[in-house]
């Protein structure tokens, strides 16, 4: 990795959130900087660059959908200024950062995904009966600026071409302004302003301080008049929480663009799974075969999308009984099962979330088959009831009927299946402690701030996309099950689209039945 340079000469406004980070980076790097500082160098590097030929793009496909989403948010908050940050880079160690990902609400309301600019902010400013939308981000510096070559965080010599304000305005079909102009927004902030708090803590603090300042000045002013849309803020920031709730609930029902992106993410994930199977000979030859699985799938995710949508679970043998095994440092042994839970995230940030469990040697043992078919029966039972009008939690309840029935039939429960299903018992949940379904979209666990009455207790609607993912997990040291069951973990997870009269399994093309999975594994070997 190239040595970072001293950013102390970069022209960073002292009023912007970037300034403190840039200054800290500069301070850390001064002890090893070799950045040329001579006037001859500065003159030489700032001249003789070709003119950029950058025709403005047509609006991207999702721009119209993003505008419609903004209109819905606007209608929910008449007269209030709304601040939705994209968020800043997150430090990994010293002067290295994690790959940037904008906040999902920002992406949803702008259509800006993996090519978005760190530190950008969407502001919906009250105007008439609605709002005017503006995206603020840092305009790129000219080649005659120190920023171009001396700022490793944003200089184009370091990170590559950055978009102009005009380019982004045309691309997203929304007004844009330089982030320095956001200072004027902060100066106008009053208590009729809401901010999406979790997206950018430093920016949120600026908004909080501005609201407090406005309230104090208003209280001290003898001639102050009430602001028509003034609202009280308590320590829990409830009005801001309302904004987080609305933008989260807006994503419960997907539009046509989102559904197409989710299907594309599923299709890419299917290809990634197939490539993992093709590499099984190499995977089984490595001490950390699970890491090879993770790497093979990640390659497909980077080729066809932005990244993996979450930490891939490549769990072989007894690791499959650990629900979120992301360490992925174990061997992959013929005769064992592999539980692969992974999803490709598109450049738009929409992600798949698929799990398949397969035998390393291409053949399920008798007990592996028994467990697998029980989980498949639970998944199919849950899918069979999905249609508009049911309550979301019924999907889980249907799967649990099968899990309780099977574990009771095998003699693992101290009561009958019916008794175990009673809320005060739930013995069968020892072998499946997680839920069966969650909403899917820009986040793998989408709509996280939605109210329970609209999520778990909500009515299923056409356009919703969620997972169905029952499983059975028998820990290696679980004395309630026979020895031959111990160390077996099986999960089958599909991504489900609710239609007008039923549902479609978006991942149905990825083999699910015992015979199909065995043929899939064997066929991938050539």
Where do the protein language model's features map onto the residues?
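Active-site neighborhoods and metal-handling regions in enzymes and metal-associated proteins
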Residues: 1-526
């Amino acid at each position: 990795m190239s040595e970072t340079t001293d950013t102390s000469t970069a022209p960073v406004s002292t009023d912007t959130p970037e300034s403190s980070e840039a200054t800290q980076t500069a301070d850390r790097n001064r002890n090893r900087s070799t950045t040329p500082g001579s006037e001859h160098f500065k003159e030489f590097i700032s001249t003789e660059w070709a003119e950029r030929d950058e025709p403005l793009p047509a609006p991207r496909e999702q721009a119209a959908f993003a505008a419609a989403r903004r209109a819905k948010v606007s209608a929910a908050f008449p007269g209030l200024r709304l601040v939705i940050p994209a968020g800043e880079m997150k430090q990994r160690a010293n002067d290295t950062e994690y790959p940037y990902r904008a906040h999902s609400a920002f992406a949803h309301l702008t259509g800006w995904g993996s090519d978005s600019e760190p530190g950008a902010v969407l502001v919906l400013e009250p105007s008439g009966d609605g709002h005017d939308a503006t995206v603020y981000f840092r305009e790129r510096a000219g080649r005659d600026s120190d920023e171009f070559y001396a700022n490793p965080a944003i200089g184009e010599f370091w990170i590559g071409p950055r978009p102009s304000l005009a380019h982004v305005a045309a691309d997203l079909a929304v007004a844009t302004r330089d982030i320095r102009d956001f200072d004027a927004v902060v100066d106008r902030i009053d208590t009729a302003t809401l901010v999406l708090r979790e997206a950018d803590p430093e920016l949120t603090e600026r908004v909080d301080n501005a609201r407090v300042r406005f309230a104090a000045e208003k209280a001290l002013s003898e001639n102050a008049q009430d602001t028509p849309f003034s609202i009280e803020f308590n320590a829990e920031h409830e009005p801001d929480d309302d904004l987080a709730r609305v933008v989260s609930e807006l994503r419960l029902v997907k539009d046509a663009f989102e559904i197409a992106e989710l299907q594309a993410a599923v299709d890419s994930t299917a290809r990634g799974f197939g490539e993992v199977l093709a590499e099984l000979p190499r995977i089984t030859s490595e001490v950390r075969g699970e890491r090879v699985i993770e790497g093979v799938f990640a390659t497909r995710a980077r080729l066809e999308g932005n990244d993996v949508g979450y930490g891939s679970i490549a769990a072989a043998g007894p690791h499959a009984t650990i629900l979120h095994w992301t360490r992925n440092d174990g061997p992959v042994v013929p005769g064992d099962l592999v539980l692969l839970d992974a999803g490709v995230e598109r450049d738009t940030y929409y992600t798949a979330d698929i799990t398949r469990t397969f035998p390393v040697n291409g053949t399920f043992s008798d007990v592996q088959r028994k467990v697998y078919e029980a989980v498949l029966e639970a998944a199919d039972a849950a899918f069979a009831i999905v249609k508009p009008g049911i309550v979301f939690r019924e999907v889980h309840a249907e799967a649990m009927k099968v899990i309780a029935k099977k574990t009771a039939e095998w003699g693992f429960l101290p009561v009958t299946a019916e008794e175990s299903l009673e809320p005060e018992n739930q013995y069968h949940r020892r072998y499946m402690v997680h839920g069966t379904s969650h909403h899917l979209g820009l986040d793998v666990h989408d709509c996280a701030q939605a109210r329970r009455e609209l999520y778990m207790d909500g009515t299923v609607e056409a356009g919703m996309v969620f997972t169905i993912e029952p499983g059975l997990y028998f820990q290696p040291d679980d004395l309630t099950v026979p020895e031959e069951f111990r160390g077996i973990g099986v999960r089958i997870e599909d991504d489900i689209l609710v239609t007008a009269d039923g549902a479609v399994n978006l991942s149905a093309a990825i083999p699910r039945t015992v015979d199909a999975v065995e043929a899939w594994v064997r066929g991938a070997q050539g």
